A protein has these predicted regions:
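Hydrophobic transmembrane alpha-helices of multi-pass solute/ion transporters
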Residues: 2-78, 91-99, 270-351, 365-376, ...
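Inter-helical loop and helix-membrane interface segments of multi-pass membrane transporters/permeases
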Residues: 2-6, 44-62, 167-199, 211, ...
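Hydrophobic core segments of alpha-helical transmembrane domains in multi-pass membrane transport
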Residues: 14-24, 35-42, 72-81, 113-117, ...
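Membrane-embedded alpha-helical segments and adjacent helix-loop junctions characteristic
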Residues: 47-147, 326-420
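Transmembrane alpha-helical segments and their short flanking loops
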Residues: 47-57, 163-202, 210, 290-291, ...
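C-terminal transmembrane helix pair
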Residues: 84, 158-161, 179-180, 344-356, ...
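Hydrophobic transmembrane alpha-helices that form the pore/transport pathway of multi-pass ion
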Residues: 97-186, 190, 396-439, 449-463, ...
Length: 537
């Protein structure tokens, strides 16, 4: 008997309770804990507190992967702290200030930087968020807007680049083949992954949506309110907001009055070099003699490489700061520890998010939701059903990887069966699993990547979730329409994707005009490219 058969519809209570409480109370850790506790009550049929604590401890002690991620997060915090105290982030800002003299240019630079940093979503949010925050503040871009740009060019970009995401996706495809019993009859996993890219429409449209929002400078929903507040009154955070971190408060003043680029380039260069070298080394070692590039990528230990790289960033920051005479060893170590401390809130939420993921696994939440979705599947509806089943599971559990693990072994056999034991529907099944998982991840306040986006941009976490949700929902609706058209007509997605981009642009224009008129605000929040530093009203 599976967890879904045992607990049924009540299995969705813990994640939904946590999500609703987080949105209403804006207290993510408390809300997550109460959601976990409700799961303990359901699971045990009693007060459930012992089960709740056991689940929480197991999230820390029984998963090597989770331990590595927590260590990476702490090292990234320490590395960012060293870069900030040594003036590296300020030096980047100073070097770019003469060129990035408008909010649009800062937004475009952040967008491009995020797309170039394609090999990891965690390091993407850490480096891009920290580097661009001061420039965004100077141009009066709201922290909510910066968090949105960072978040939507982290995981979506990582799904297409040389990253741990792609390796994980390939492993999920193999699991789907095994579940369907078609390993010798279907395309190679990497080939299917490439075929699925045009159907990963949420990620493609999410990246494009960021560009449309930045270039047109049009906003709607709660983001319009945030941008209007920031631009008109200089408040990059709303009154009473609780930002996830503040480098100034946590780390103190910079150790120099003359920031130099080397204090950014050396630690970050070390991170990049070690991550790429470590990935190549582990990939070659595991792939055997004379491996092809695909084999190297498929066998690379990207998480391990990121662990080594984040450590090297801390070490290089310490060495360059001490040898450069900006601080002694004791002060450097205190800075690193301050950086660790700065990540405690994010680490706490990550542990709670992983724990509620354990709860949903034990109660069978994902399997229950997927089984319900299966009852309405037809060839035409298959892409949209998989998309929204994945979205609901990811939103409820806060983990896109966990969602892929739950849905892919079900979606691939379904697509094979509905497609008449032919591979026709496999690419769309794989692409829509990934799309739905990342959409749910973007909208969930218990998602690790969403949490880290708030952390490294210094935004209020729930404010980030609430403002981003309007844009994510817009993107998923456009993706749904395009997938429905594909299901009905089988027109190539290479034709549908440009149409979807045009529809996105039209929606952004129309919604921004309507919302601004409704709120009696300028659709562009009174921003003008001629003003590099707006005056207060």
């Amino acid at each position: 008997m599976t967890g879904a058969e045992t607990f049924g519809a009540i299995s969705v209570v813990p994640p939904l309770l946590a999500i609703v409480l987080a949105i209403v109370t804006r207290r993510a850790i408390l809300s997550l804990f109460l959601g976990i506790w409700s799961g303990g009550i359901i699971f045990t049929g009693s007060i459930g507190i012992i089960q709740t604590l056991n689940w929480t401890v197991s999230s820390l002690g029984e998963s090597l992967f989770n331990a590595k991620i927590l260590t990476i997060v702490m090292f990234l915090g320490g590395g960012v702290a060293m870069i900030w105290r040594l003036g590296g982030a300020k030096a980047i800002g100073n070097a770019a200030t003469s060129r990035l003299d408008s909010q649009r240019k800062v937004g475009l630079a952040t967008w491009i930087f995020g797309m170039l940093w394609f090999f990891g979503d965690y390091s993407n949010t850490a480096i891009v968020g920290t580097t661009m925050r001061d420039m965004a503040d100077e141009m009066r871009m709201s922290r909510e807007k910066l968090s949105y740009i960072i978040d939507s060019t982290a995981a979506p970009v990582a799904t297409f680049g040389i990253s741990s995401w792609v390796v994980y996706q390939l492993s999920m495809i193999e699991q789907g083949y095994e579940a369907a019993g078609i390993s010798g009859q279907a395309p190679e996993a990497f080939s299917l992954f490439l075929q699925s890219i045009p159907f990963n429409m949420y990620c493609l449209f999410a990246i494009v949506m960021v560009g449309i929002i930045i270039i047109t400078q049009r906003d709607f929903g709660e983001m319009l309110d945030a941008e209007h507040r920031s631009w008109k009154h200089g408040k990059v955070l709303r009154d009473n907001a609780v930002p996830m971190q503040s480098a100034e408060d946590s780390l103190g003043e910079m150790a120099t009055d003359s920031p130099q680029l080397r204090y950014f380039l050396l630690p970050v260069g070390s991170l990049i070099t070690v991550v790429f070298a470590g990935s190549a080394y582990t990939g070659i070692a595991a792939a055997g003699e004379n491996p092809a590039l695909i084999d190297i990528v498929g066998n690379a230990a990207f998480v391990d490489a990121l662990l080594w790289g984040s450590f090297s960033m801390v070490a290089m920051g310490l060495i360059s700061g001490v040898t450069g005479g900006l601080m002694d060893l004791e002060e450097a170590m205190e800075t690193i520890i301050d950086g660790f401390s700065m990540m405690i809130t994010a680490a706490s939420i990550l542990v709670m998010a992983w724990t509620i993921g354990t709860v949903t696994t034990e109660l069978g939440t994902g399997i229950y939701v997927t089984n319900v979705a299966e009852t309405i599947i037809s060839p035409m509806l298959l892409p949209v059903v998989i998309l929204f089943a994945s979205a609901v599971i990811a939103f409820s559990t806060g983990t896109s990887w966990g969602t892929m693990a739950i849905v892919t072994p079900i979606a691939i056999p379904l697509a094979w069966s509905i497609g008449g034991s032919a591979p026709t529907l496999l690419p769309v099944a794989v692409g829509t699993v990934f799309s739905g998982a990342i959409f749910g991840d973007h909208c969930s306040p218990i998602s690790d990547t969403t949490i880290l986006s708030s952390t490294f941009t210094g935004a209020d976490h729930i404010d980030h979730v609430r403002t981003q949700m309007y844009y994510a929902v817009t993107v998923i609706l456009v993706a749904s329409v395009m997938l429905l058209v594909w299901g009905a007509t089988r027109i190539t997605p290479l034709v549908l994707l440009p149409i979807g981009v045009g529809l996105l642009y039209g929606l952004v224009y129309g919604l921004s005009e309507w919302d601004a008129s409704r709120k009696n605000l300028a659709p562009q929040a009174a921003r003008t490219e001629q003003q590099s530093s707006p005056s207060d009203d």
